[in-house]
């Protein structure tokens, strides 16, 4: 499941980068996402440049919207992620960050570093709940955006059950 999660996040991020710059979506990206069902990648009715938390989260106070991007950059830096030239709260950047967190999770699992593994999963869940989910729940309706919304929601559930399971296993071993 984990390797698939990293690939889906990375692919979605690439798709939004290509859409941001009005470039064709690479065939390999289309093929990965279309494995989940037929997806219409046409987002002409949506301004891809506006797919940002500080723009779309309607109940965000103006004072927070003004510092939101720097908060995001600080969060990224804590995990060694450098935001691209796009706004730090743009969906392409947030999806790329999740991909990097999942890749780190894979590495920690391979090294059998259980304590760090729990922490990185908790960080993923925190990021989804605090940043990515509020963004995707405010996305306009379009097939690709609906897919992103559903994927993020299901990933949050997966992470939560994984974290609860690990916590219970740790309690059983004490």
UniProtKB/Swiss-Prot annotation:
Keywords: Chaperone, Cytoplasm. Disulfide bonds: none annotated. The keyword rRNA processing does not apply. It is found in: Cytoplasm. Gene3D superfamilies: TorD-like. GO terms for cellular component: cytoplasm. InterPro entries: DMSO/NO3_reduct_chaperone (IPR020945), TorD-like_sf (IPR036411). The keyword Disulfide bond does not apply. Binds specifically to the Tat signal peptide of the TtrA subunit of the tetrathionate reductase. Monomer. Belongs to the TorD/DmsD family. This is Tat proofreading chaperone TtrD. It comes from Archaeoglobus fulgidus (strain ATCC 49558 / DSM 4304 / JCM 9628 / NBRC 100126 / VC-16). The lineage of its organism: Archaea, Methanobacteriati, Methanobacteriota, Archaeoglobi, Archaeoglobales. The gene is ttrD.
